[in-house]
From Swiss-Prot:
Gene3D superfamilies: 2.60.120.40. Keywords: Angiogenesis, Basement membrane, Cell adhesion, Collagen, Extracellular matrix, Hydroxylation, Repeat, Secreted, Signal. It is found in: Secreted, Extracellular space, Extracellular matrix, Basement membrane. This is Collagen alpha-1(VIII) chain. High levels in calvarium, eye and skin of newborn mice; also in various epithelial, endothelial and mesenchymal cells. The lineage of its organism: Eukaryota, Metazoa, Chordata, Craniata, Vertebrata. Homotrimers, or heterotrimers in association with alpha 2(VIII) type collagens. Four homotrimers can form a tetrahedron stabilized by central interacting C-terminal NC1 trimers. Disruption phenotype: COL8A1(-)/COL8A2(-) mice exhibit decreased proliferation of measngial cells, reduced phosphorylation of ERK1/2 and increased p27(KIP1) expression. Diabetic COL8A1(-)/COL8A2(-) mice reveal reduced mesangial expansion and cellularity and extracellular matrix expansion. GO terms for biological process: angiogenesis; camera-type eye morphogenesis; cell adhesion; endodermal cell differentiation; endothelial cell proliferation; positive regulation of cell-substrate adhesion. The keyword NADP does not apply. The gene is Col8a1. It comes from Mus musculus.
Amino acid sequence: MAVPPRPLQLLGILFIISLNSVRLIQAGAYYGIKPLPPQIPPQIPPQIPQYQPLGQQVPHMPLGKDGLSMGKEMPHMQYGKEYPHLPQYMKEIPPVPRMGKEVVPKKGKGEVPLASLRGEQGPRGEPGPRGPPGPPGLPGHGMPGIKGKPGPQGYPGIGKPGMPGMPGKPGAMGMPGAKGEIGPKGEIGPMGIPGPQGPPGPHGLPGIGKPGGPGLPGQPGAKGERGPKGPPGPPGLQGPKGEKGFGMPGLPGLKGPPGMHGPPGPVGLPGVGKPGVTGFPGPQGPLGKPGPPGEPGPQGLIGVPGVQGPPGMPGVGKPGQDGIPGQPGFPGGKGEQGLPGLPGPPGLPGVGKPGFPGPKGDRGIGGVPGVLGPRGEKGPIGAPGMGGPPGEPGLPGIPGPMGPPGAIGFPGPKGEGGVVGPQGPPGPKGEPGLQGFPGKPGFLGEVGPPGMRGLPGPIGPKGEGGHKGLPGLPGVPGLLGPKGEPGIPGDQGLQGPPGIPGIVGPSGPIGPPGIPGPKGEPGLPGPPGFPGVGKPGVAGLHGPPGKPGALGPQGQPGLPGPPGPPGPPGPPAVMPTPSPQGEYLPDMGLGIDGVKPPHAYAGKKGKHGGPAYEMPAFTAELTVPFPPVGAPVKFDKLLYNGRQNYNPQTGIFTCEVPGVYYFAYHVHCKGGNVWVALFKNNEPMMYTYDEYKKGFLDQASGSAVLLLRPGDQVFLQMPSEQAAGLYAGQYVHSSFSGYLLYPM
């Protein structure tokens, strides 16, 4: 049976149109839509709802001016070849508007051109059913909402008052107050201290008179300078030999320290005797010292809150000091719901796959295809559909982790002491039991009466020798020995070093009376009058100075001044001809025993083979700060060490040449106080103390003149750990010096 050709042509046209519509949908957008760049978020008006999670109803998104336009702004859903979830999918194909050139169907068998088949505009169709929820929209950029009103005031907290705080820092100095009114006129003050004597007045006119008598003898003049040393006198005759002297024995020395304990003697034989009767209980001992604080008890239960008392009168008081921060209180109850927070920042763009396509609808009854009319105009945009109902609330979330433990509670109150039970009756006297094991040593009891004298024990072994005792007191000086023979006058010695500056001498005698002065000052003011009544007058001129007061008592001698600048260099020394005995110092004087040694103190050999005339002198510096306490300070860097009498390894100067020596030390103080002592033979001669100030480097000095004999030792030592801040550095030198003033 043949089919009419016209229906076949219409079916071909419909098939071509459906293929074109499917191709456009599969390409990703209608009308050639291009995807947007992902980095530029579109500006969505605030009335468009925010992104909502999948599974909830999304309100219909209007198109046109109120929503996303159907142009190039539509974002591209990049999910490969998956079909977008569209309301037209698998439904009736809506009329597709053609933009630009009209679609001209291909010419083939049975095809008829449609240019002349333009029909009239059809009636407006009814709104279709609500489609499935569309893809999630882009995140909105909303404006922050208006700040909410403050919530109601919370209830006042309940807590214990804190401890009084530490005293605050002193406040800043206040502004000067207003100037006060002028006070009443004061009384006339007492007489002031007489002022210093004024300068002598000008010379008066020469008087006319007779020459006076001879004046009183003047005061003796000042002591003249010492004259030059005269030539040595001729040697005197040898005197008779004196009688033999005798010396008194010295006092016994101090008792030495006790010797070491000897080893314990052998154990004695066990005693034989019956155990004594149990003694009466001793008196009750004194109350023991309180024991150490016990461990904190377990946390007590929370007490019942007390009844709130009536409100007291408003107190008036000064603010107390800041209290010590108390212990953390118990965690408070859950507060009321706070104000709604400000809207958060926009979330990240949602990522979700399009939903599953809906079920395929039933196929309708095929109608007779009508004649294809011309292209109609675009119909008006339909009204947006109503929003879907809200979804059901979700399931409750997983409970959160347990919070941190609360703070330690306050210790509970101390329990009351129990009732002391009644004292039991004394039991019967028991029989003496067997000898028990030796018990632990008991507490020291009261001293009992002295027992009977025991038998003498065996002689113990000889104990070790005790420590050497301290040197005894110096003996009584012996009688004066016989006068020695006068020695031969020696050669003139070298010029000695400059001596220590002497103490300032007393004031000189009063000078002769001066020329009569001018007219004397007015007399002393009279006694104070009665207080006057009136405003204070203008300040008067400064009165003349009063008469000088009486000469006061002589003041205490001042502290020794700082050492003066070094003097000019002296004349070149004249080296005397060395004696054949090789004496290194001229005229060494007598020895300790009154007899001049035969060869005195020989000097060391010089570069050219002759004796070197070295003086016992030294200067040493400290290189290691904070030396140990209780031992001689080791000044280990030598600047000069004549005759090698100072040992830098021990810090001790040992006298070789007897005589009068001058010692000086200069120390620095840092990090603590410093207290040093100058020792002579383990005996402190003088102390020097300096107090340390934080942030400062202080100094202290000391000097002394000592008489030394051969073998005497001199050194510096710090006697206390509490003042051991002796410091030294690369450019901060602490030094110790000494030299011979003159031999004996």
